């Protein structure tokens, strides 16, 4: 007989691990680890290099266009560009960085060091620690927690500033005909002169 709902004990024992298409999976990370070993990054140093990549991207941006200079601290013969290139061969760089977003967040808070481009990115000083483009990983339950958890959760201002920055990054003035009237972009205004255009999907 088919059971459509569980009994009390089965329900109490039911477990679920959060997954998100915007965050790297363990299988994807293992694929990257294998590729990295092939260029001289030991498996034991995977986190060190992953964290260095995420930190560097948090100072700039994490995208297919990201080109990182310098070498891996724990594997000096390997360039960050090469390490990032192998990440991109498996999944988008930002998706990889989101996996480590909570570690980036904690480190920057504990060292009082906001992302380098926070002012250029038009973030208010009160939200400067949220000024990295994979910040949404801090609130994504599929991204792992640091051993001691978050130092603190993001404030409403930080969440709002990051969301605004995300929409601003999407908005482009182009003659593509893709127009948005989303309140996040127009702030409720309807002036024709304020129309914002989005890139084609």
Swiss-Prot record:
Required for genome encapsidation. Forms ribonucleoprotein complexes along with TGB1 helicase and viral RNA. GO terms for cellular component: helical viral capsid; ribonucleoprotein complex. The keyword Ribonucleoprotein applies. This is Coat protein. Keywords: Capsid protein, Helical capsid protein, Ribonucleoprotein, Virion. The keyword Ribonucleoprotein applies. Belongs to the potexvirus capsid protein family. One of its GO terms (molecular function) is structural molecule activity. It is found in: Virion. InterPro entries: Pltvir_coat. It comes from the Viruses. It comes from Lily virus X.
């Amino acid at each position: 007989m088919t059971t459509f709902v569980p009994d009390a004990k089965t329900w109490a024992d039911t477990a679920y691990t959060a997954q998100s298409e915007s965050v790297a999976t363990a299988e994807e990370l293992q694929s990257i680890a294998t590729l990295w070993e092939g260029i001289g990054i030991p498996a034991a140093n995977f986190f060190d290099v992953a964290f260095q990549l995420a930190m560097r991207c948090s100072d700039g941006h994490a995208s297919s266009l990201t080109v990182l200079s310098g070498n891996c601290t724990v594997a000096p013969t390997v360039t960050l560009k090469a390490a990032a290139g192998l990440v991109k061969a498996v999944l988008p760089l930002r998706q990889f960085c989101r996996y480590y977003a909570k570690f980036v967040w904690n480190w920057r808070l504990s060292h009082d060091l906001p992302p380098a481009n926070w002012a250029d990115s038009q973030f208010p000083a009160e939200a400067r620690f949220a000024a990295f483009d994979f910040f949404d990983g801090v609130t994504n339950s599929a991204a792992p927690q640091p051993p001691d958890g978050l130092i603190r959760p993001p404030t409403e201002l930080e969440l709002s500033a990051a969301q605004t920055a995300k929409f601003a990054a999407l908005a482009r003035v182009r003659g593509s005909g893709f127009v948005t009237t989303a309140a996040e972009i127009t702030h409720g205004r309807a002036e024709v002169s304020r129309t914002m255009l989005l890139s084609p999907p």
